[in-house]
């Protein structure tokens, strides 16, 4: 994530329904993107359907039409999200994909872009499609060179009617801010907290911030209230860390990433509490009552690392988050009383354990909600 600095000769593109003249904004024009991405259709069965493009799953299970998406992408990075066609009963607003599908003869999806502009890539989402209420489901991947694309769905009905739905997507490269111990004092938890507080005041999620931490142990609680990557080099947190709720911008999701750090407890407390999307990449979490905890609004992405010697290794108790994944990948859960707890997940969620090892735990997975669990790529676990 990083701020996009607009050249002096340019102005920031107007968002849908925006107006340069404040007076004109009091009577906004219809949103052309929303007009292009949805339609109402009366089927041969006499039922009226609301058909629209969207990205799902959405926060708290709600699905809204999406005709325009703009996002900043770090240099060399990509974004990946669902691109779907949804169908609702126009009166009850209940999902109606199955009934509408009986009226559908064929369909296709295409991507158009100006000359010289890269195109986003679409592919089947085999794992997610059965869990989704969408009529049509693809995943979309883009990089910063996909500056302006139109994703066009064409639906051909058995009646001979043809429906066109268009979602416009725009992506640009972010600029980045990197802070090292040479740039700011980072030897103590108090110094780190002061830096994080300053970053929260001066930047939003449009700025890609990386803080390179020194080889120290932070022995006081730390609260993270900004979108940031904290990259360790022998760094340890020996007191609880809390990721506070963060605000997305129009073009960036806000999240916190911990990379190659250790969370070392004394048998009590919670190592990391995530009230916003939080990545733990190649981290060690040891010696806590609860090692990592996701609560409402937050999520914990576990990608590589070791979670051992905790009362509960990782606990998911989050009914909603604007960003989450199904996969826990390359994690060794060793010698925890309970390795993984699935108390509450967002709607239609499940857990996919990919190349994980569960050994020496009292209970490998506690799943009172009965969520679906997939075991992939040699994962060793007792369910």
Task: Say what each PLM segment does.
Residues 31-111:
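Solvent-exposed, low-complexity, repeat-rich "mucin-like" stalks and linkers
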Residues 131-146:
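Extracellular/luminal low-complexity segments enriched in Ser/Thr/Pro
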Residues 66, 100-134:
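Low-complexity "stalk/linker" and mucin-like segments enriched in Ser/Thr/Pro/Ala/Gly
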Residues 168-196:
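Right-handed parallel beta-helix/beta-solenoid
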Residues 228-273, 284, 383:
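Right-handed parallel beta-helix/beta-spiral solenoid domain characteristic of secreted/periplasmic
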Residues 184, 189, 206-228, 233-240, ...:
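N-terminal extracellular ligand-recognition/capping segment immediately after the signal peptide
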Residues 219-221, 238-240, 261-267, 286-290, ...:
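Surface-exposed loop/turn segments connecting beta-strands in extracellular beta-rich domains
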Residues 229-232, 256-258, 278-282, 299-304, ...:
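All-beta strand scaffolds that present successive hydrophobic residues in beta-strands
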């Amino acid at each position: 994530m990083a701020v996009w600095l607009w050249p002096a000769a340019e102005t920031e593109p107007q968002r849908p329904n925006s107006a340069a003249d404040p007076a004109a904004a009091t009577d906004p024009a219809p949103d052309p993107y929303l007009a292009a991405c949805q339609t109402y259709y009366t089927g041969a069965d006499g039922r009226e359907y609301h058909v629209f493009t969207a990205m799902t799953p959405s926060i708290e299970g709600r699905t809204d039409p999406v005709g325009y998406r703009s996002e900043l992408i770090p240099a060399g990075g990509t974004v990946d999200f669902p691109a779907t066609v949804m169908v609702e009963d126009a009166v009850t607003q209940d999902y109606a994909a199955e009934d509408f599908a009986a009226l559908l003869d064929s369909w296709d999806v295409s991507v158009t872009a100006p000359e010289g502009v890269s195109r986003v890539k679409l592919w089947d989402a085999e794992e997610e499609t059965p869990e989704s209420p969408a009529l049509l489901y693809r995943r979309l991947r883009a990089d910063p060179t996909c500056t302006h694309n139109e994703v066009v769905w064409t639906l051909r009905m058995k009646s001979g009617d043809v429906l066109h739905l268009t979602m416009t997507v725009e992506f640009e490269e972010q600029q980045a801010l990197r802070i090292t111990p040479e740039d700011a004092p980072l030897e103590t938890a108090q110094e780190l907290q002061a830096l994080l507080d300053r970053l929260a005041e001066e930047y939003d999620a449009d700025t890609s911030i990386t803080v390179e931490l020194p080889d120290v142990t932070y022995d006081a609680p730390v609260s993270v209230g900004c979108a940031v990557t904290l990259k360790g080099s022998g760094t340890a947190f020996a007191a609880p860390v809390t990721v506070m709720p963060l605000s997305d911008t129009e073009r960036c999701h806000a999240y916190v990433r911990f990379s190659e750090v250790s969370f070392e407890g004394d048998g009590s407390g919670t190592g990391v509490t995530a009230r916003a999307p939080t990545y733990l990449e190649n981290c060690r979490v040891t010696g806590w009552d609860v090692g990592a905890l996701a609560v409402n609004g937050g999520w914990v992405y576990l990608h590589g690392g070791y979670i051992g010697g905790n009362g509960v290794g990782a606990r998911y108790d989050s009914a909603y988050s604007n960003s989450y994944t199904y996969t826990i990948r390359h994690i060794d859960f060793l010698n925890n009383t309970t390795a993984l707890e699935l108390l509450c997940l967002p709607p239609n969620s499940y857990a996919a354990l990919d190349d994980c090892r569960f050994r020496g735990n009292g209970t490998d997975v506690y799943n009172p909600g009965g969520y679906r669990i997939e075991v992939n790529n040699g994962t060793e676990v007792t369910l």
